[in-house]
Structure formats: C-alpha cells, structure tokens
Amino acid sequence: MSRVNPLSSLSLLAALVLAGCSSQAPQPLKKGEKAIDVASVVRQKMPASVKDRDAWAKDLATTFESQGLAPTLENVCSVLAVAQQESNYQVDPAVPGLSKIAWQEIDRRAERMHIPAFLVHTALKIKSPNGKSYSERLDSVRTEKQLSAIFDDLISMVPMGQTLFGSLNPVRTGGPMQVSIAFAEQHTKGYPWKMDGTVRQEVFSRRGGLWFGTYHLLNYPASYSAPIYRFADFNAGWYASRNAAFQNAVSKASGVKLALDGDLIRYDSKEPGKTELATRKLAGKLGMSDSEIRRQLEKGDSFSFEETALYKKVYQLAEAKTGKSLPREMLPGIQLESPKITRNLTTAWFAKRVDERRARCMKQ
C-alpha cells in the first residue's frame, strides 16, 4: 500500500479539533473479567530497565480511555506483548543494516526509472536542511524515524527526490508497535493529544506509536475466541484470521486449493482473484450472481461480512460436504517480506510469539 507523506490540512484541522476532547465509555467486560488500573499494571509489567516507564504507563492509560477500550489485564498485556515483540519497548528502535537498505531502495528506484546511479549519488551530496549532505545522513541512519525524516526532506527539497519518490515517503511503518503509517493517517479521529506536525511524525513518538498501534490491535469488533487471532490480524490486516478460515471453507466446498492469506478480493484491481473465482464456482448452489458474490466479498474488511448470505451459505455448503464443523478463525499462511527481515518468518510465527509474551505477562 502506498503511504501519503504529508497530512492534509483538512485532516490536520480535524485532528486539532478532536485533540483532548474525546473519551469514550469503555467497552463492556467479558464474563469473568475485571477492570484494572491501566497505568498501575503497565508500571508493574514493564521491565524496570525500560526508559520512561512512567510515561509509557500514562500514555497507555490515556490511549485506553480515549478509545473506550476495556481496561483488562488481557488487553494491556496484549499491547505490551506487541510492543515488546516489535521494538523491545524502544520508541525508535534501531534497524540493523538500515543504511544499506535505504541505499538499495534509492538505487532500485533509479534503475526502474533508467536514471544512472552516479547521477543520483551525486545529487545526494548536496546539503540537507540539518547541515549535513543527504549522503552523509543516509550513511549514518540507524532508525526508521531518522530515515523517514531524510525522505521527507529529500522529497520536499530536492527535485531528484521528487523524481524518484513522487510525494510518497517509502518508510511505511514506525514507532514502538511498528504500526502502518497509512493506517494511522486513516484513523486520527479521537486522537487525544495536539499534534505538532504530521500524523507520520506522530507515529514515531511514544504516545502516537502506542495510540495508533493499540487502535490497530484492539479497536475493532471481532468474534475471535483468543487474542492470538488479533495478533495475526495486527500483522496481516483486520479480519485476516476470519477471512483465512472463510477461504478454507470456500476451498472445501469448491475443491479449489487456495492460499489461506485472508485476502478475499484483489484490492489493486477489479479483476477477480483466486478466492473470488473459486467462490464463483459455487454460484449455482449459492443462488447468487458473480456481481452479488463480488459485492459481498468486498465486505471482507469489516465485521458485517459475517452477517452476509455469502458467508453463511459457503459454510453451510462446506460443512455439508465435509460432514463436520469448520473453524471460523485460522492463522493466515503468509510469508513475511521486508528488507528488515532476514529469516524465513510467517504471520503465524509472529502471532504465536506475541501470544507467548502475552501469556507470560498475564502470569507475572
């Protein structure tokens, strides 16, 4: 997904108007749960070695209050588990080999646009707003926050930067929970603090990274039986675990083997993807047209998909064919791809690791 770098003036105005004035009534507690004091639990659960532990506690307490989240041990430990997994509680974690990754991205863009590398490297020797050349800053960059700032300057100040990147900053995630910047830009409503800059810059702060990361993890309705499926969704996108289970049902009913990745349609095209084509094979039994199937699959990024006729009928067909009840939640089978990842990792691996951390947190 492309990430728009500057926050539009309209979004900024909305964020400023909403800042500091939006608390919601907390979500109802589940049976057997009890409310906790979020700040006290964070101070208790975070290692004493964490810098600004008190500030983390206050920011997370404000996050829970402003988003109306149920203040439970499971929810707090879930957020802490993601932050520990993603950054080891560092607001702006260092990324090994980030300078090399950045230069490779620049060279890749130049090659794609048929611009000689030496021209690009020469252009980057000019002085940037902080007094150092862009080359010097790229050579010494250690964190995504630093790299994002370099690209912001490069895009806004240097014609070559605009040629290579347009208005799109290639740094796509940030902060202590490594939340998507595009996601944050789309979910500013209710943000409780005044923003001094863009949403992108806010994501790289402790409070912003926690607020948007927690929103992505907990602030959507789901029918999951365990937190591990939210952890998978955090990595793969909202409802990926539910949608992977639905793909499994489509596969059982149609006989078509599908990748259980949680993507029900092609979001980059109106052309049908493999899941949509497999579902179309069931059109006669479903009593639905191709266009009806498409319209209902498009609800796959919302909770309401579970209430569609398509969702219910596919499970009826699949369970009748297999003679057994099928799961409504599955860990998606997605290979994690990023220049920062040097091992063979999957969404399921991520979800299980985070869930182990959550369980340890709750037992402490």
Label every PLM stretch briefly.
Residues 2-4, 16, 20-364:
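Cell-wall glycan-active module
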Residues 1-11:
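Bacterial N-terminal signal peptides that target proteins for export
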